[in-house]
């Protein structure tokens, strides 16, 4: 995985955060039920990764109280707009979706799951600068 991994949080607090402007491309909050239908149904196929999406994706496992999560939130919003229809960026609030976070062994946030159309997803932990996100998107997700 490309890029320097900077900082992350571990622990607990509260919350939710994800409003943006207009109807331009933006990050999408997911519940466990939505994850099972849009990303991967790990309950039906616990031993095999089967991506259900129609474009590469990033899943940001975050919490609203986490400083590094707050740092990358606007970066992810910018990337969602910049890459438009090429990728989708999902967000999973680890405070409200504890079972989903547990299924992926999330112990440190932010944790980012990079999901290419083919092959296995890759997990990265900690905040990254925008340039590192772009490098990972281009190499891992878009094969540029």
Specify the residue positions occupied by each region the protein language model found:
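Short pre-active-site segment immediately N-terminal to redox-active cysteine/selenocysteine motifs
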Residues: 54-57, 61-65, 108
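Conserved helix-turn-beta segment immediately C-terminal to the redox Cys motif
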Residues: 53-56, 71-92
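Glycine-rich active-site/cofactor-binding loop and its immediate structural neighborhood
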Residues: 89-106
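Structural signal for short hydrophobic segments within the conserved structured cores
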Residues: 26-28, 88-90, 122-124
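Non-catalytic, surface beta->alpha helical segment in thiol-disulfide oxidoreductase systems
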Residues: 108, 113-144
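N-terminal targeting signals for export/organelle localization
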Residues: 1-36, 142-144
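Conserved redox-active cysteine motifs that mediate thiol-disulfide chemistry
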Residues: 61-75
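A short beta-strand-turn-helix
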Residues: 30-56
């Amino acid at each position: 995985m490309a890029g320097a991994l900077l900082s992350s949080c571990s622990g607990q607090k509260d919350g939710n955060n994800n409003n943006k402007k207009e109807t331009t491309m933006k990050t999408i909050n997911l519940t466990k039920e939505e994850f099972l239908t849009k990303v991967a149904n790990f309950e039906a196929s616990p031993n095999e990764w089967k991506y259900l999406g129609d474009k590469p994706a990033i899943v940001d496992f975050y919490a609203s109280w986490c400083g590094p999560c707050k740092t990358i939130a606007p970066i992810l919003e910018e990337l969602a707009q910049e890459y438009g229809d090429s990728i989708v960026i999902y967000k999973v609030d680890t405070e409200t979706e504890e079972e989903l976070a547990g299924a992926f062994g999330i112990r440190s946030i932010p944790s980012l799951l990079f999901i290419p159309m083919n092959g296995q997803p890759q997990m990265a932990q900690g905040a990254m600068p925008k340039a590192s996100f772009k490098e990972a998107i281009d190499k891992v997700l878009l094969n540029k």
